[in-house]
């Protein structure tokens, strides 16, 4: 007999405004407990120093979290010129202090050099793993691990404020871009060094900034539910976004329910008007029920790639 999961079955995505000072996994575990969810996962770690958008996926939505991991990100960052730290942020120790002789024109010219596709070597103080361990664990032990450079794209990087030794910027970038590394490299270009003092992720994919909620707000709703003796899900679940919001950027292929049944049993189908190639978001019927993602095979058919398992099917299998 299958081991029963602890927690309730719930599917969807919630946009958490991660506070500073805790890890992304700590954030995930707190929210998972509040929702009493049986299954949950985050979509890419934020540094403890960083705040902002952290999409968390529940239940079947975890199947599509990779699309959020691979999506574009937006950040607001404040850097302090004149000081380098061993972590490239204010959590580390100052290892070098230099005089700052920078004007706005020079700063803007250097910032412009980061736009476009370049190679970036990840920071040792990152969550990137080497032999199963995050790089920052090696760094804390004083061990330097060789890292391969990776292609990143900075779609835009704009100077918002330059006051004294503080530089504030907005960055729109591809996955895997380390803002601390950009800041460190900028400091070297300017000849004075720099480190991050504030970092906030303001966007993941096309999720609305205003849809973010704090852990404190969720805890307040949970307390209210207990106080008023109502089910917590009545207050918490309306904050969830649909599971297909993680793949909303994919082209939709809507099919009649008969074809959807074939797809849900693993069979490719011919759908009029489907794209000629690529990955697609599959929906069924007039209500456009999300059933999973598929790809266009060599015969031009829509073939299942990752399917939603509906709750009634789960219950039947028990």
Swiss-Prot record:
The active site is at 47 (nucleophile). GO terms for biological process: mRNA pseudouridine synthesis; tRNA pseudouridine synthesis. Gene3D superfamilies: Pseudouridine synthase, PUA domain. Its EC number is 5.4.99.25. It comes from the Bacteria. Pfam families: TruB-C_2, TruB_C_2, TruB_N. InterPro entries: PsdUridine_synth_cat_dom_sf, PsdUridine_synth_N, PUA-like_sf, PUA_sf, tRNA_psdUridine_synth_TruB, tRNA_sdUridine_synth_fam1_C, TruB_C. Responsible for synthesis of pseudouridine from uracil-55 in the psi GC loop of transfer RNAs. This is tRNA pseudouridine synthase B. The lineage of its organism: Bacteria, Pseudomonadati, Pseudomonadota, Gammaproteobacteria, Vibrionales. The gene is truB.
């Amino acid at each position: 007999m299958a081991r029963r999961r602890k927690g309730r079955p719930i599917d969807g995505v919630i946009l958490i405004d991660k506070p500073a000072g805790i890890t992304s996994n700590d954030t995930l575990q707190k929210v998972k407990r509040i929702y009493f969810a049986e299954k949950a996962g985050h979509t890419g770690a934020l540094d403890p120093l960083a705040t902002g958008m952290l999409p968390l996926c529940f239940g079947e939505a975890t199947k599509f979290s990779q699309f959020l991991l691979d999506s574009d990100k937006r950040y607001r960052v404040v850097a302090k010129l004149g000081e380098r730290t061993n972590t490239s942020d204010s959590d580390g120790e100052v290892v070098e202090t230099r005089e700052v002789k920078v004007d706005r024109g020079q700063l803007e010219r250097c910032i412009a050099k980061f736009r476009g596709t370049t190679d970036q070597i990840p920071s040792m103080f990152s969550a990137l793993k080497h032999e199963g361990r995050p790089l920052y664990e090696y760094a804390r032990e004083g061990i330097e691990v060789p890292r391969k450079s990776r292609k990143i794209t900075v779609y835009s990087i704009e100077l918002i404020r330059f006051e004294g030794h503080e530089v504030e910027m907005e960055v729109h970038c591809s996955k895997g871009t380390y803002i601390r590394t950009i800041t460190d490299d900028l400091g070297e270009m300017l000849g004075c060094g720099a480190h991050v003092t504030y970092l906030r992720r303001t966007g993941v994919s096309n999720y609305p900034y205003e849809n973010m909620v704090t852990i404190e707000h969720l805890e307040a709703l949970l307390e209210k539910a207990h106080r008023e003796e109502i089910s917590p899900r009545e207050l918490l679940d309306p904050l969830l976004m649909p599971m297909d919001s993680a793949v909303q950027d994919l082209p939709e292929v809507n099919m009649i329910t008969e074809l959807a049944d074939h797809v849900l049993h693993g069979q490719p189908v011919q759908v009029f008007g489907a794209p000629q190639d690529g990955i697609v978001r599959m929906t069924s019927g007039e209500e456009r029920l999300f059933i999973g993602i598929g790809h266009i095979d060599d015969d031009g058919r829509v073939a299942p790639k990752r399917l939603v398992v509906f709750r009634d099917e789960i219950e039947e299998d028990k």
